[in-house]
């Protein structure tokens, strides 16, 4: 039975925001005191800190909502996951694609060293956005004139990253919606391109730049395809917080970076061809309900559960001691202050939910304009 949202947002919000502020504070101290002297040591510690926060979101998906992620991969891809630097390119299908990536990274042992190219506004989100900034996520303004230098600088600084990392790049530039698909189809018709049915037309400038810079130190590109089966409801943050489950199928295919074309034009064509093939792959999945590759076991490790229990016990003990010491609930002013704090937490969680919703992302008109510029 679905749980009323109001009974979920407040306790989960308090848990995530308070633990997140603690993690953010430690990250800030380490950024100032350690990173200037040893970037490698800072990254190793920050990897652990990031997992202390991000594993709570993995727990929400895995244990609270019981979302099932089914991985399809060939033997080479499956054995390589988490053991090497990798550039991840994926279709952007749902509100929680980034969380699905975190789940797969956690299963592969590299959650704390996952990275992504994201829109600039993401880094201003309290707790989660700040943690991503400290973890060296790349934030772009969706204007190539401004973003080219930022992207190149951000990628070049990863050359000495001490642990295997995954860098996710959503080359479609925005989440898939029917309106954006229509805009992409109109543009494809005007340019004599294959009309997409299940994906958007990739924006390849960022991908070409990434391959050009990373081919010397990143051995692989993981072509990732995400789809929700027809008989399963679309996963959203709202549904997950309500404890409502879903099923997500993910197909991953490793491509050796050494086999990538050399010229920028050919790299761009390679990316576009991958998405044409991905479109056909999704057509086949819609018809058969599965991918051809073998289903790989990824389980549901208890690590995220243990981390969430740790934070729950720590913060509950701290809250009890705090209210004993301050006697905050013994006065009307204290009660009002506490109520205001809870309202603030609820408001911040509402912002998180709204931020994740695809229908609130870029409009179809903006999507059409971006495709034309590409």
From Swiss-Prot:
Give me the Gene Ontology terms describing cellular component: endomembrane system; membrane
Could you tell me what reaction this enzyme catalyses? a 1-acyl-sn-glycero-3-phosphate + an acyl-CoA = a 1,2-diacyl-sn-glycero-3-phosphate + CoA
Q: Which GO terms describe its biological process?
A: CDP-diacylglycerol biosynthetic process
* Keyword terms, alphabetized: Acyltransferase, Lipid biosynthesis, Lipid metabolism, Membrane, Phospholipid biosynthesis, Phospholipid metabolism, Transferase, Transmembrane, Transmembrane helix
One Pfam family name is: Acyltransf_C
Motif HXXXXD motif, residue numbers = 92-97
The keyword Nucleus appears for this protein: no
Identify the enzyme class.
transferase
Q: Which CDD domains match?
A: LPLAT_LCLAT1-like
Q: What is its EC number?
A: 2.3.1.51
Q: Membrane spanning segments where?
A: 15-37, 48-68, 121-141, 305-325, 335-355
- Location(s), subcellular: Membrane
Q: How does it sit in the membrane?
A: Multi-pass membrane protein
The record's listing under PANTHER family reads: 1-ACYL-SN-GLYCEROL-3-PHOSPHATE ACYLTRANSFERASE PLS1, 1-ACYLGLYCEROL-3-PHOSPHATE ACYLTRANSFERASE-RELATED
Q: What does this protein do?
A: Converts lysophosphatidic acid (LPA) into phosphatidic acid by incorporating acyl moiety at the 2 position.
The written remark on domains in the entry is: The HXXXXD motif is essential for acyltransferase activity and may constitute the binding site for the phosphate moiety of the glycerol-3-phosphate.
- Family recorded in the similarity comment: Belongs to the 1-acyl-sn-glycerol-3-phosphate acyltransferase family.
Question: What name does this protein carry?
Answer: 1-acyl-sn-glycerol-3-phosphate acyltransferase PLS1
The species is Zea mays (Maize)
Underlying gene: PLS1
């Amino acid at each position: 039975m679905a749980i009323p949202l109001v009974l979920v947002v407040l306790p989960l919000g308090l848990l995530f925001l308070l633990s997140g502020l603690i993690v953010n504070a430690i990250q800030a101290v380490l950024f100032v005191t350690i990173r200037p002297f040893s970037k490698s040591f800072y990254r190793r510690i920050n990897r652990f800190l990031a997992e202390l926060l991000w594993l709570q979101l993995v727990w929400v998906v895995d244990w609270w909502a019981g979302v099932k992620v089914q991985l399809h991969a060939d033997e080479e891809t499956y054995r390589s996951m988490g053991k090497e630097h990798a550039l991840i390119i994926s279709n952007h299908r749902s509100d929680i694609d980034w969380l699905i990536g975190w789940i797969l990274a956690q299963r592969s042992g590299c959650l704390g060293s996952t990275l992504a190219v994201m829109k600039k506004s993401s880094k201003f989100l309290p707790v989660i956005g700040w943690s991503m900034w400290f973890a060296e996520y790349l934030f772009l303004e969706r204007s190539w004139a401004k973003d080219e230098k930022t992207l190149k600088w951000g990628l070049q600084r990863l050359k000495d990253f001490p642990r295997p990392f995954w860098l996710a790049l959503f080359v479609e530039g925005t989440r898939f919606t029917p309106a954006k698909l229509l805009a992409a189809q109109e543009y494809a018709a005007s340019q004599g391109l294959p009309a997409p049915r299940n994906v958007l037309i990739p924006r390849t400038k960022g991908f070409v730049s990434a391959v050009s810079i990373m081919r010397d130190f990143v051995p692989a590109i993981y072509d990732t395809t995400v789809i929700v089966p027809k008989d399963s409801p679309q996963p959203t943050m709202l549904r997950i917080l309500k404890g409502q489950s879903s099923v997500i199928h993910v197909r991953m295919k490793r491509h050796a970076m050494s086999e990538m074309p050399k010229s920028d034009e050919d790299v761009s064509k390679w990316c576009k061809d991958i998405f044409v093939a991905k479109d056909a792959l999704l057509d086949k999945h819609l018809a058969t309900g599965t991918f051809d590759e073998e289903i790989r076991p990824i389980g549901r490790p208890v690590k995220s559960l243990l981390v969430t229990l740790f934070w729950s016990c720590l913060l509950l003990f701290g809250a009890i001691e705090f209210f004993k010491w301050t006697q905050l609930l013994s006065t009307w002013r204290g009660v009002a202050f506490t109520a205001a704090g809870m309202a603030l937490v609820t408001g911040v969680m509402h912002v998180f939910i709204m931020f994740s919703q695809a229908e609130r992302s870029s409009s179809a008109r903006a999507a059409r304009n971006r495709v034309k510029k590409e």
